[in-house]
Regions:
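Helix-loop-helix hairpin linking two adjacent transmembrane segments in secondary transporters
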Residues: 98-101, 134-193
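Paired small-residue
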Residues: 89, 100-109, 301-309
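Cytoplasmic helix-loop-helix junction between adjacent transmembrane helices
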Residues: 105-145
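C-terminal transmembrane helical hairpin of 12-TM major facilitator-type secondary transporters
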Residues: 275-324
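Helix-to-loop junctions at the C-terminal end of transmembrane segments
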Residues: 62-74, 263-275, 360-361
Length: 405
């Protein structure tokens, strides 16, 4: 505990690198390696799409299992176990090319990644228990900078690596990613250990969540899951459809990642000030704008602007629901609440790309799918806007943060 008080930001850095592994490399690097895998292995779009679905199904299962286990095992144990196993699964992905092997490990990457990702928020929520503003910033850095770092590193290196060495070197790309994640592991595990606390009393751990009072926030977060993933899934395809060069595509991804990294600075005050659904509604509106902009106004400037707007907002949605849980629920309910939000998100993001793909096929233009995703995000924003702060919040937390609607 003494070391935590002395070096809380170093502890946060370890947690953020955990998100870099589980939410960055484990999920978004796949989209950059996939073209090489398709080219080398002769996969069709159905096979490539199946691996995305397999990963999402694993993520759902991992989120559900975490929700069931969070009352019995500490967040530290679940975070550490999920992180180690995600690292091993990333390494295994580069060993054998057969589709059944790739399916197995994409499922497990999703499963273990969800376990570590959802508990990272629980751990970060306890970093500054008596300083809501710093706590809001810490949670935003966890998801924003942690996830954005992986997109910057992946976007800057993977396309160039595969272009230089050839598509048949995709297995080595996975091994390199696993090696980088392995370097992060010691600090990640150290940070989690510094935040280890005794398991909560069983009676409290099993106390039901006030779902009837937080349904609007849950529905808004479902809209986030449905909409954001469409942009990230089809961004490269849309740019290719618009005849963008490989270097420009890489530049857009790097700009997107850098914007994600600095997004905590943009949203920290809003996240700390409001205990209602307003922060999530504002974030979803910005994501919707970023998704629609390149379709409504085609061109390089529009794409670069969309990358900035989308990047400054997209990873703040998990920060918004984590802060909402922290500001409105007692500490022993944070784990269950964040796990529930993760389950809702996981189911929604599984449906999003499939539905968007169907819409794009019917319309003959993937841009229609981006507009559809923008509409879902706006609907989620409207619903989230109706979320009010809960009555009887945890004593001391909201009063210090200047709770507003």
């Amino acid at each position: 505990v003494t070391e935590l008080h002395k070096r809380p930001w170093l502890v946060l850095a370890g947690l953020a690198l955990g998100v870099t592994v589980t939410n960055g490399f484990a999920r978004f690097a796949y989209g950059l390696i996939l073209p090489a895998m398709q080219s080398d292995l002769g996969w069709n779009y159905a096979q490539a799409g199946w691996l995305n679905t397999a990963n999402a199904l694993g993520y759902i299962a991992g989120a559900v299992v975490t929700m069931l286990m969070i009352g019995r095992y500490s967040a530290t144990s679940l975070f550490s176990f999920g992180l180690i196993t995600t690292n091993l699964a990333l390494l295994a992905t580069g060993l054998i090319a057969e589709l059944w092997w790739q399916t197995l490990w994409r499922v497990l990457v999703g499963f273990f990644g969800a376990m570590s990702f959802s508990t990272a928020g629980v751990l970060a929520a306890g970093l500054f228990p008596n300083d809501p503003r710093r706590n809001a910033l810490a949670i935003a850095i966890l998801f924003g900078t942690g996830g954005g770092l992986a997109i910057v590193l992946s976007g800057a290196s993977l396309p160039l690596f595969l272009d230089h060495y050839g598509a048949d070197h995709w297995p080595l790309a996975w091994v390199i990613i696993a090696a980088i994640c392995l370097l992060f592991l010691p600090l990640c595990l150290w940070s989690a250990a510094k935040l280890k606390r005794p398991a909560p009393p069983q009676a409290k751990a099993r106390a039901p969540l006030p779902i009837s009072q937080i349904w609007a926030q849950l529905a808004g977060y479902a809209g986030f899951g449905l909409g954001y993933i469409v942009f990230l899934t089809f961004l490269s395809a849309w740019m290719t459809q618009q005849a963008a060069s490989a270097s420009f595509i890489a530049a857009v991804w790097i700009l997107l990642g850098l914007s994600i990294c600095i997004s905590p600075l943009v949203w920290r005050a809003i996240l700390a000030r409001h205990a209602s659904g307003l922060p999530l509604a504002m974030i979803l509106t910005c994501i919707a704008l970023g998704s629609a902009l390149p379709v409504l106004f085609p061109g390089n400037i529009s794409l670069l602007s969309a990358a900035v707007i989308f990047g400054l907002s997209v990873f703040m949605a998990p920060s918004a629901v984590t802060n909402f849980a922290r500001q409105n629920l007692p500490a022993h309910s944070w784990g269950a609440a964040i796990s529930l939000f993760t389950v809702v998100f996981a189911v929604a993001q599984t449906l999003g790309p499939y539905a968007a793909g169907l819409l794009g096929d019917l319309a003959g233009d993937i841009g229609i799918s981006l507009l559809g995703a923008s509409g879902l995000l706006l609907l989620g924003a409207v619903i989230a806007l109706t979320q009010k702060p809960l009555p009887n919040p945890p004593r001391g937390q909201i009063a210090q943060s200047g709770k507003q609607e």
